[in-house]
């Protein structure tokens, strides 16, 4: 759902750059005031997990593929502001290091992928009573929140490219929302599964201001959590089919003559993406580990 450069008007791209930038600054101030230092490693680990998990594309209808977004999950675990800030870090890193989405369109991508999923998913989760639920009810509410947030995100994306003239608005809305009704099922299932698992093994992580401590066992589990998506990539591979937005933009009149979905999603681009993503996740892990060791050293008398 990452919009490349050249498909949004300057007015829409610029407006969303301002909105997303202001929201990031506000969220950063809120997180600094509201959270203790113990949340920083949790945010880092979850960012690395979402970054890695988003590389796992699975085939869906019509020769397209989809992947986990994770905004609702992060908002539920960290709160909407910290979840949005963590998701924004992932999307900005993808744009800067992997060329996944354009730089001019970065504000639009942060708005669609981060703001819409985090805030709408969290609002749905809380309004349905997810914060005080457990078991099957927690799983059901998590599924609904994850599924619905992806529909809102895809609708916003379609509206932006449709109003910009990249694709007819009616076609864009029906295609994006229709495909993401299917992708949202996977999003909802993964959101529900992770919430149910954490509710059983680490219920303190389900509370933003919970007393839980991020200890050695959590670090080991976090490494495993981040390694799992890469292990699946190596052993089973990931679908190289274009995602719904790439499929849609491949027939846009704004695309240069002769270009198509294969050019937007070539195997060379895929391997280059995989290598740089692996390097980036390793750097994230080393940075978090260095911060953790530094905190332990400074806490010693």
Regions found by a protein language model. Give the residues of each.
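Membrane-interface capping segments at transmembrane-helix boundaries
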Residues: 29-34, 201-205, 288-301
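Individual transmembrane alpha-helix segments
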Residues: 4, 263-286, 290
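Glycine-rich ThDP/TPP pyrophosphate-binding loop and its adjacent helix/strand module
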Residues: 141-214, 218
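Alpha-helical membrane segments and adjacent membrane-interface helices in multi-pass membrane proteins
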Residues: 57-121
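Juxtamembrane non-transmembrane "cap" segments at the membrane-aqueous interface
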Residues: 155, 238-264
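Hydrophobic transmembrane alpha-helices
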Residues: 2-10, 14-73
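Hydrophobic core segments of alpha-helical transmembrane domains in multi-pass membrane transport
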Residues: 17-29, 49-54, 119-122, 146-157, ...
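Short helix-perturbing small/polar motifs within transmembrane alpha-helices
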Residues: 112-153, 157
């Amino acid at each position: 759902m990452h919009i490349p450069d050249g498909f949004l008007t300057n007015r829409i791209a610029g407006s969303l750059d301002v909105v997303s930038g202001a929201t990031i600054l506000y969220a950063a101030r809120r997180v600094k005031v509201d959270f203790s230092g113990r949340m920083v490693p949790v945010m880092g680990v979850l960012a690395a997990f979402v970054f890695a998990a988003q590389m796992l594309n699975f085939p869906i209808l019509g020769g397209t593929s989809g992947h986990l977004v994770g905004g609702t999950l992060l908002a539920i675990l960290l709160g909407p502001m910290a979840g949005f800030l963590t998701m924004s870090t992932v999307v900005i890193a993808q744009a800067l290091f992997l060329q996944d989405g354009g730089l001019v369109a970065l504000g639009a991508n942060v708005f669609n992928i981060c703001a819409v999923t985090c805030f709408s998913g969290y609002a749905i989760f809380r309004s349905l009573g997810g914060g005080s639920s457990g078991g099957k009810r927690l799983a059901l509410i998590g599924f609904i929140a994850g599924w619905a947030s992806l529909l809102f995100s895809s609708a916003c994306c379609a509206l932006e490219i449709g109003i910009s003239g990249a694709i007819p608005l009616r076609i864009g809305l029906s295609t994006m929302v229709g495909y993401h009704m299917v992708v949202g099922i996977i999003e909802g299932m993964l959101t529900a599964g992770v919430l149910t698992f954490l509710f059983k093994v680490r219920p303190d992580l389900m509370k933003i201001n919970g007393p839980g401590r991020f200890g050695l066992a959590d670090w080991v589990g976090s490494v495993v959590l981040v390694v799992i998506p890469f292990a699946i990539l190596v052993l089973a591979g990931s679908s190289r089919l274009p995602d719904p937005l790439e499929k849609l933009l491949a027939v846009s009149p704004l695309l240069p003559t002769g270009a198509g979905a294969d050019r937007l999603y070539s195997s060379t681009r895929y391997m280059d993406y995989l290598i740089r993503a692996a390097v980036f996740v390793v750097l994230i892990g080393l940075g978090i580990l260095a911060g953790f060791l530094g905190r332990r050293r400074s806490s010693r008398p």
